[in-house]
Amino acid sequence: MIRDGNEGMYTIPGFNQIQFEGFCRFINQGLMEELHKFPKIEDTDQEIEFQLFVETYQLVEPLIKERDAVYESLTYSSELYVPAGLIWKTSRAMQEQTIFIGNIPLMNSLGTSIINGIYRIVINQILQNPGVYYRSELDHNGISVYTSTIISDWGGRLELEIDRKARIWARVSRKQKISILVLLSAMGSNLREILDNVCYPEIFLSFPNDKEKKKIGSKENAILEFYQQFACVGGDPVFSESLCKELQKKFFQQRCELGRIGRRNTNQRLNLDIPQKNTFLLPRDVLAAADHLIRMKFGMGTLDDMNHLKNKRIRSVADLLQDQFGLALVRLENGVRGTICGAIRHKLIPNPKNLVTSTSFTTTYESFFGLHPLSQVLDRTNPLTQIAHGRRLSYLGPGGLTGRTASFRIRDIHPSHYGRICPIDTSEGINVGLIGSLAIHVRIGHWGSIESPFYEISERSKKAQMIYLSPSRDEYYMVAAGNSLALNRGIQEEQVVPARYRQEFLTIAWEQIHLRSIFPFQYFSIGASLIPFIEHNDANRALMSSNMQRQAVPLSRSEKCIVGTGLERQTALDSGVSAIAEREGKIIYTDTHKIIFSSNGDTMSIPLVMYQRSNKNTCMHQKPQVPRGKCIKKGQILADGATTVGGELALGKNVLVAHMPWEGYNSEDAVLISERLVYEDIYTSFYIRKYEIQTHVTSQGPERITKEIPHLEDHLLRNLDRNGIVMLGSWIETGDILVGKLTPQTATESSYAPEDRLLRAILGIQVSTAKETSLKLSIGGRGRVIDVRWIQKRGGSIYNPEMIRVYISQKREIKVGDKVAGRHGNKGIISKILPRQDMPYLQDGTPVDMVFNPLGVPSRMNVGQIFECSLGLAGDLLKRHYRIAPFDERYEQEASRKLVFSELYSASKQTKNPWVFEPEYPGKSRIFDGRTGDPFEQPVLIGKPYILKLIHQVDDKIHGRSSGHYALVTQQPLRGRAKQGGQRVGEMEVWALEGFGVAHILQEMLTYKSDHIRARQEVLGATIVGGTVPNPEDAPESFRLLVRELRSLALELNHFLVSEKNFQINRKEA
C-alpha cells in the first residue's frame, strides 16, 4: 500500500499484486532453494561425479510474445540454463558446460500463465498450519477427553490423547492407538531419558504394566510393536535393519516432517528452543506436547480454535510452483543417474549436455497446469470475473478438505476473517464457505499468514501510522470498526465507538482504542465492494449479487453506472482490458487495430484487441479513445475495453424501471421489458464460438483438406474457398461445412456401400476410398465467420501437423428466456416483451423499460435496490454520477435516505417536474397504463437502477428434439442438448393427451413415432405403397427395456393377449 501526499491517506493496492508477489518470490527465492537441494550424482563405482553450479543460473527472455503464444497454442515460458560439471575422480579432470534443463512458465501482466495457448491461473489454497493443537471433546459418557494433535507439513496427523485414568495414548493418522512410551522408545528414547525430561514423571511411571515394560525395554522391541500396529500387513515381523529403515522412511521422515512453519509454531506453542533448521519431529517435541496435555487435563492452559486464521496458512502460487520445480528436479536426478550408469556400462564417454533432457520439466509443469485442482482455466466472462478469479481462496485441493466431508463450523464465518476474508463473497451450492475471496487490502505474509492493514492511534503523535497485522497479533488490540468517523473529521474524546477485542465486539470510549480500520471496504472482496448501499441488503442477497456480477456479459454499447462505489475505475485498470499509455507523447496514427504515438523521438505502436473470443465465448475488443494529434500523458486511457467506459467498469445499463405487478407477467421473479431494449440494441451482445479440426497422419496416409467432397450437396459447400476452408465474412447456417476433410480408409470390397458396388460392377466407376470427416456447424451456431486460423505448431510432430480454427460471431438481442439481474441479488427471467406503447409511462410521457415485481423486495430484505433506483433517477435528470462508500450512516442517522431524498428534491426543482419528488409518497410517482391511458390506483416506485444481462442465455439452453440419435443397446433416445437428445413426448405431454382422450394419437406417439422398430419400418412401406398403416402387434422397445430391468431385479413379467374370436387367454413371452 502506497503512502499518499495527504496525511493518513493511502491508495488501494493492485488487485493482482498477490499473484505477482507470489511469482516473484518463486523466481527470486524458490528456484535457488530447490536448486541448492540438487545433490551430487555419482555412478555405482564412484568414478564420475555430476553436479550443478546453481549460483549462476540464467532465465532467458521468451522467444515469442504473449499474443503469438495464444495464437499458435504454445506455452509462454522462459528457458532455464544452469552450468553443470562432470568430474572424473581418477584424473581429477572436469568438463563444464551450460546446459538447458527445462522451460519455466512465466506469469503475464494479468497474473496468469499461458499454457498451450490457454490462459490459466493458480488460485490460493488455505490449509491448516503445521504444529501442535489442543482440543477437548465429549465421549459417549459425557466426559471431556483432551487431545493433542501434531500436524505435519504435508497434512499427516499424530494424536496424543489422555483418558480418564490419566493414561496417554498415541494414534497415527486415526489408526489403532498405542502407548506413548512405545512411540518414544521407537523414536530412540529410553525410559530414563523420558522421565528426566517431563514435568509429571509419576504419570508416566504409573502407566506401564509388565507387558508394556517388555515392549519398551529395548528400542528393537518398541520398533517391532510400532511396526506391527501401523505398517505390518500380516504375520509376526522380525527385527532387522531393513525393517528399521522402512519404518524410518514411512513414518519418521514423511509423517513427522514439520517444516519451517511447523517448527516455528511448535516452538512458540510449547516454549521450546529447538533450532529452526531441525524441521523433523523429535522425542523432545512429543514429551513437551504430552506435558502440556497433562496440564490441560488439570485445567491449566487454553484450548486452540482450529478455525482461527492464526492456525491457517496460505499456500500461494509460489509454494505450488516451487513444489513442482522440486519434483521436476527429482525426476531429472533419477534420469541423470540412470544415464550415467548406462554410459559407464556401455563404455561411453558422457558429457553434461547428453546427460540432461528437458522432458522432466515439460511433463511436470504440463501435468500441473493441466490436471492440478488449483490450476484453473481463467474465467474471462468480463474484467471483474478475471480479477476476482485470481483473488480466490480454496479450502479444497490436495491436503485440504472435500465438499462432502467439510463441516458447517469450517464453512462458517469466523471473527478472525474480519478484514482478511470477505464474509459475503463465496460460492453457492456444495462448496459454500469452502471457496472464498480475499478482502481488497490484504497481503500474504512471509509465513503464509493473511495480514490486514490498520491505523495505529498514538497519543504522542497525532499522525496516523499504518501497520500490517497477522491474525495472531490483532486480537490483543482494541480495534475500532470501520464504521467510525474518518480521520479528518476529528473525534470527540468522550465519544463511544464500536470496537473488536479478542473475537468479541464491544462498545468502548475512543481513548481506549489502539487501532482502527483504514477503509469502509476493508472487510469486502472486489465483487462485494462494487455493490452500492450494501449495508442495506441482506447478506444472502449480497452474496448472490457478487456472484452474478461475475456472470455479466459485455454489451455492444457499454454504459457506466449512475450510482457506484468508487472502485469501478481501479477494477477496470487492474484487469488489463484498457490500453494505457506507458509514457507521455503525441498520437501520430490511430485505427481499430493499433495506436501509434511518438515519445522523445521514439515511435511506439500499441496493438489493440479486435473481436477476440474469451473462454466463455464472450467478445473482447478495444475501442480507441484518443484522436490523432492529441498529446497524452503517462497513465492516460488510450482505448477502452468491451466493458469499460472512460476507464471505469461498465457491466450493464441504466434503464427506467417500475416496481409494480403487470397482469401476472412479472410474478415469481419474472421481468417484463419494453421492445425498445431490443430495437435500439440496449442489451445486444456478441458471442464468438470456436470450431477446430485437426489433420492426422493415419496408417493409410495423411488426411486432406479439400473442397472436393463426394456425395455432399453443393449447397453445403457454398462457403468454402478453393482450399476447402470457409471464407471470411460468410454467413453460416446449421449443418454447413466449415472445413472439408477427407480421411483415407482401406479399400476392401466389404467396406463399400451397396450402391458403390453397383456402380463398380455396371459402369466400372472407381469409387473413392476416402471417408468424409469434414467440420460441420453444430446446432445453434449460425453466424458470421470473423476469423480463420491455419496453425502448424513450431517443431510439431508429423502425427499432428496442422490445426484449423474457425471463429463465428453471433449477434444476440435480448429475448424471452434471458436472465437479467441488478446489483442487489434481484434477478429474473424475461417473460414478455411488450410494445413500447403498451408499457406503463411516466407523467412526462416516457415509457418505462422494465417492470419488476415489488414483492421481490420485502421478503428478501435487499432494500439497497430501492436507494439505488431512486438515486439513479435523480442522477439521470441532473446529469450526475454518484460514487458512494458503504456504511455512510457512520456520519449521521439515515444518511442514505437523506441523500436520496435531497437529490430527488433537487432534480424536481431543476427539471420543474413536481412528480419526481412528491412529499406524500417520496420516491414514488403516479404513472399511467399504456394500453388505456388511465392512471394506476397506487403510486409506483420508479427509478434508474443498473441492470446486467447475464451469461445464462436462452439460446444456449432451449432445445427441442424432432428426430435424432438412439442408443444402440436400449434403442432409447440419447440425453443432452449436444447429442440432439431428449423426448418428443414426455410424461406431462402424455398426461395432456390422456386428458383429451386422443387414444389413437397417443398410440402413434408411443409406438410408430417413437421406439417401435418394426412398426416404424411398416409405416415407411405403407407410406410408399399407399396402403393403410397396420396396427403394431408387439410391445415397443421402452416396454421391453422395462421388462429387462425388472428381470434384473429377479422379477419375471409377462403380458397376455385376449383373442378376439374365442376370448381364449394365450400366454405370450414379452
UniProtKB/Swiss-Prot annotation:
Keyword check for Transcription, yes or no.
yes
Instruction: State where it is primarily located.
Output: plastid
* An example molecular function term from Gene Ontology annotations: ribonucleoside binding
Keyword terms of this UniProt record = Chloroplast, DNA-directed RNA polymerase, Nucleotidyltransferase, Plastid, Transcription, Transferase
Question: EC class of this enzyme?
Answer: transferase
InterPro entries given in the database record: DNA-dir_RNA_pol_bsu_ext_1_sf (IPR042107), DNA-dir_RNA_pol_su2 (IPR015712), DNA-dir_RNAP_su2_dom (IPR007120), DNA-dir_RNAP_su2_hyb_sf (IPR037033), RNA_pol_bsu_bac (IPR010243), RNA_pol_bsu_CS (IPR007121), RNA_pol_Rpb2_2 (IPR007642), RNA_pol_Rpb2_2_sf (IPR037034)
- What's a single GO BP term from this record? DNA-templated transcription
Q: What is its EC number?
A: 2.7.7.6
Q: Which GO terms describe its cellular component?
A: chloroplast; DNA-directed RNA polymerase complex; mitochondrion
Q: Name the protein family.
A: Belongs to the RNA polymerase beta chain family.
Stated name of the protein: DNA-directed RNA polymerase subunit beta
Q: What does this protein do?
A: DNA-dependent RNA polymerase catalyzes the transcription of DNA into RNA using the four ribonucleoside triphosphates as substrates.
Record carries keyword Glycoprotein: no
